[in-house]
Every structure is written in structure tokens, then in C-alpha cells.
């Protein structure tokens, strides 16, 4: 199932394709996935808190251990619940940027982490409420050049999800590349 893109990254900012408006996402107020799942079906209070445009976009923190509590053992019941809540968000036109996070030593486990997030993307592939994924700081700070963990993360998730937009902290990207190079990346910097 191919989902039509509703958002795009231009000049390192997020824009609605149909509205042409710049859209802000408050990553400082990102909601933990457990809390997001608890409010399923009643997103009106969340939407009211999101300022600005008609396109309401929020960030949801997704810990790696929620997806893969043990090595190579995905929590399919959690992923099914997460998908269901994202489908409910879709019905209310609430959009989500997934902010994956992991514990220490993420750079050493980048391939396993990326595999878990790719698995997550496959499980939520029909959720048009998903704008895209943020690249964790530990990966973004290593660079987006070919063969680097951040580039691998984006490439792996983009394979079957061309409509996703990717996000990264500006400070993390600046650590890895020249600012002029970072500004050329198809990323939304925050």
C-alpha cells in the first residue's frame, strides 16, 4: 500500500504539500508513546494545544525497548496497539512524528536499532497519520554521509516508505557535517 505524501522537507523546514504552509513541531513537548496510546480516540485536547496551521503535528517518543523488549523479539501486541491508535489519530487529522530513542551505546547497536524501527514502520505502513521519523542524536551526530548510521537509518526506512519526512536536531547534525552540507540534506532540522 502506497501512501500519498502530505508533508515535505524544504529548506530544512516542514511544509504541508497541499496547504504550502510551514508547520512547526514542538519536540520539547513530545509525548511518551504510553501516554499517546492512553488518549486514543480523544485527541481533541491534544489538537487544541498545537498552535498554528490546520495540519496538527505532534511528536511521540518511541523507546526501542517498547518495540524490541529482548534482542530479536518484537512486541507485536504493542505494535498492533500503536497502529490502532495511529489509525484513530488519522481519523481526526492528527499527524505524528515518531521520535525513536534508545539507551546508551546506540552508535554501537545502530544496525539492530534501525532494524527495529524498520520493523515498526512495516507494522504501521498504512497509517497516513505518520509524517516520518526523527533520527536519534547518537546517529545524526555521526553523519549522514554514505555508510554512516544516520544515512543507513534513513535509507532503510525510506525503502518502502517514500512519503516519510526525516527530522534531526540541528546541533547533532552540525557536529557531524559542515553546516552548509547539513542545510542541503532533505531533513527537517529542529
Question: Can you say where each PLM-predicted feature lies in the sequence?
Answer:
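Active-site region of glycoside hydrolase catalytic domains
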Residues: 118-190
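Active-site-adjacent "subsite" loops/lids of carbohydrate-active enzymes
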Residues: 103-122
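Short catalytic/ligand-binding loop motif for oxyanion handling, primarily in non-cytosolic enzymes
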Residues: 67-69, 104-108, 141-143, 174-176
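N-terminal carbohydrate-binding accessory modules
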Residues: 1-61, 155-156, 178-190
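Aromatic-lined substrate-binding rim segments of carbohydrate-active enzymes
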Residues: 42-104, 150-161, 165
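Serine/threonine-rich low-complexity intrinsically disordered regions
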Residues: 26-28, 32-35, 39-42, 63, ...
Amino acid at each position: 500500500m502506497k501512501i500519498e505524501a502530505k508533508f515535505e522537507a524544504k529548506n530544512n523546514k516542514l511544509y504541508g504539500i497541499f496547504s504550502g504552509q510551514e508547520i512547526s513541531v514542538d519536540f520539547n513537548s513530545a509525548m511518551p508513546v504510553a501516554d499517546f496510546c492512553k488518549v486514543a480516540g480523544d485527541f481533541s485536547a491534544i489538537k487544541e494545544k498545537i498552535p498554528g496551521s490546520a495540519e496538527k503535528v505532534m511528536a511521540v517518543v518511541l523507546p526501542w525497548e517498547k518495540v524490541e523488549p529482548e534482542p530479536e523479539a518484537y512486541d507485536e501486541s504493542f505494535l498492533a496497539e500503536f497502529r490502532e491508535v495511529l489509525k484513530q489519530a488519522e481519523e481526526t487529522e492528527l499527524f505524528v512524528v515518531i521520535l525513536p530513542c534508545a539507551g546508551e551505546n546506540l552508535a554501537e547497536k545502530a544496525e539492530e536499532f534501525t532494524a527495529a524501527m524498520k520493523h515498526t514502520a512495516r507494522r504501521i505502513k498504512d497509517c497516513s497519520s505518520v509524517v516520518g521519523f526523527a533520527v536519534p542524536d547518537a546517529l545524526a551526530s555521526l553523519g549522514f554521509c554514505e555508510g554512516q548510521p544516520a544515512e543507513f537509518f534513513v535509507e532503510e526506512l525510506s525503502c518502502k516508505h517514500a512519503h516519510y519526512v526525516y527530522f534531526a536536531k540541528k546541533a547533532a547534525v552540525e557536529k557531524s557535517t559542515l553546516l552548509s552540507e547539513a542545510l542541503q540534506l532533505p531533513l527537517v532540522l529542529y
